[in-house]
């Protein structure tokens, strides 16, 4: 087999044609490109401009984030502070300015250590998010009226969250090396721009995206550390370790999983242990609040409660939601082990977080941020992504119109309860639709947009192209579960020859795999 040239010795103009161009692979992307001059031509000279995919996508992400800030302008200019329902009718609500005073930052109270007046008692956020909030309060001017300080606090947080948004877009762009332009889906996602400054979720999403990038680069310890930090900012990221465990089981990569798990545990403890030891009541508030919180906005449980004469108690919902989540975890594990070809890491990460969102007793509109980067990596198909985003934007508008209805008194300006139930249903169906498409790709790998272009698992790191060692079901009996690649599976270098090896730029067809001899086979 001809030696593969290194990245250092290969000009960009030679490497670039191996990149996947969305305007050639995706009909919706091609149609959308007409707004900026049409699809890229076959003879386009690539790799010679300052405008690399990473730079373009980072700037687009900043631009879309700025549009999201403009959308919040009516609230910034007064709706957060005057009128019971105006912040909802303008669909520009944010927790950030309200919690500046409501959680004691205006009074310089120390999160977790100083008790708050009222029923909440302590800050109800994980430690790293509390640190983020506290740092923003240090950067906020302490002079002027409370309204002026809250405006400053929101702006400071918006600047910090914009950095997180760029990190997310760049990490997604760099995770699938041959598909950098998939990052545009993150940068252009309307639900991302609309919900980015509602709360502090982008911190955890940025750390999770960076963790996935590190795993794709075969750095399990760095992955674990970043995932541990993400879990210290929000609870959901630790769920990704579940499907990763099953994938490493199927591929026999226990050592790498152990490193990742150890790094995550150490990072989480470094952040949490000091607060646990010296302010346990404040530290535990997030967990007790999550457990004691009743059925809330956005979940199918709320529809059930609103339409039942004898609604279930919070304890019952907690138990049932946990059981449903465990069933989903079992189903995802079984799917991983019986799939004809080992699922990609991003596919399972998306499914496990989507399962948590669908079964949880609350769905705040900013939770869509958890799924956006994972959805792009799991199924980078513009049509399906935009269908899901349309559903999420509909829910975003629905919840604010419902709150406008409930807070406008006898005027009842907004969306009544039945209409809000339909909005919840749209959100649930949109998320389920994307889940079904991902599951179909797992069961029918030739339908997977990533694998159609010759990749195996570009976000999988050590799993990319690895042989299977434990498989269940028909795949184990037929021996069709192995998808081994000799060397890096993403690029086919070398001149064509009589023995059938690949020529430069030649691509393996859908459903084929590369054997140890470099030949294509079924």
PLM regions and their residue ranges:
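Periplasmic/ER-lumenal interhelical loops and adjacent helix-loop junctions
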Residues: 277-323
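Multi-pass membrane glycosyltransferase architecture that uses lipid-linked
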Residues: 2-284, 322-522
């Amino acid at each position: 087999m001809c030696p593969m040239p290194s990245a250092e010795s290969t000009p960009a103009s030679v490497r670039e044609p191996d990149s996947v161009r969305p305007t050639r692979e995706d009909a919706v992307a091609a149609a959308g490109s007409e707004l900026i001059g049409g699809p890229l031509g076959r003879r386009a000279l690539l790799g010679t401009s300052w405008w690399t995919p990473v730079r373009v996508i980072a700037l687009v992400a900043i631009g879309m984030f700025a549009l999201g800030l403009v959308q919040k302008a009516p609230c910034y200019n007064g709706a957060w502070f005057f009128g019971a329902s105006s912040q909802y009718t303008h669909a520009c609500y944010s927790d950030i300015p309200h919690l500046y005073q409501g959680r004691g930052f205006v009074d310089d109270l120390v999160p977790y250590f100083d008790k708050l007046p009222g029923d909440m008692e302590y800050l109800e956020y994980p430690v790293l998010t509390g640190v983020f909030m506290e740092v923003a309060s240090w950067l906020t001017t302490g002079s002027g009226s409370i309204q002026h300080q809250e405006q400053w606090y929101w702006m400071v947080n918006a600047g910090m969250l914009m950095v997180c948004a760029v990190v997310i877009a760049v990490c997604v762009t760099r995770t699938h090396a041959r598909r950098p332009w998939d990052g545009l889906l993150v940068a252009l996602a309307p639900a991302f721009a609309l919900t980015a400054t509602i709360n502090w979720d982008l911190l955890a999403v940025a750390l999770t995206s960076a963790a996935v990038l590190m795993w794709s680069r075969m750095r399990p310890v760095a992955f674990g550390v970043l995932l541990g930090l993400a879990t210290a900012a929000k609870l959901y990221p630790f769920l990704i370790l579940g499907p990763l465990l099953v994938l490493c089981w199927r591929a026999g990569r226990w050592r790498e999983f152990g490193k990742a798990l150890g790094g995550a545990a150490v990072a989480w403890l470094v952040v949490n242990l000091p607060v646990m030891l010296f302010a346990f009541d404040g530290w535990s508030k997030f967990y007790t609040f999550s457990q004691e919180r009743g059925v809330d906005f956005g979940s199918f449980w709320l529809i059930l409660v609103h339409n039942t004469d004898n609604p279930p108690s919070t304890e019952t919902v907690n138990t049932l939601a946990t059981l449903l989540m465990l069933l989903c975890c079992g189903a995802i594990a079984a799917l991983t082990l019986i799939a004809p070809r080992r699922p990609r890491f991003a596919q399972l990460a998306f499914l496990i977080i989507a399962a948590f969102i669908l079964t949880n007793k609350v769905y705040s509109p900013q939770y869509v941020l958890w799924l956006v980067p994972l959805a792009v990596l799991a199924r980078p198909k513009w049509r399906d992504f935009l269908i899901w985003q349309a559903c999420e934007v509909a829910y975003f508008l629905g919840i604010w119109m419902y709150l406008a209805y409930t807070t406008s008194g006898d005027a009842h300006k907004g969306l009544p309860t039945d209409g809000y139930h339909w909005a919840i249903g749209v959100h649930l169906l949109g998320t389920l639709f994307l889940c079904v498409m991902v599951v179909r790709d797992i069961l029918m790998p030739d339908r997977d947009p990533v694998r159609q272009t010759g990749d195996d698992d570009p976000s999988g790191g050590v799993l990319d192209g690895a042989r299977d060692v434990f498989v269940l079901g028909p795949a184990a009996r037929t021996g069709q579960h192995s998808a081994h690649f000799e060397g890096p599976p993403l690029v086919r270098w070398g001149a064509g020859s009589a023995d059938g090896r690949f020529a430069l730029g030649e691509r393996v067809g859908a459903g084929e795999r590369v054997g140890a001899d470099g030949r294509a086979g079924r």
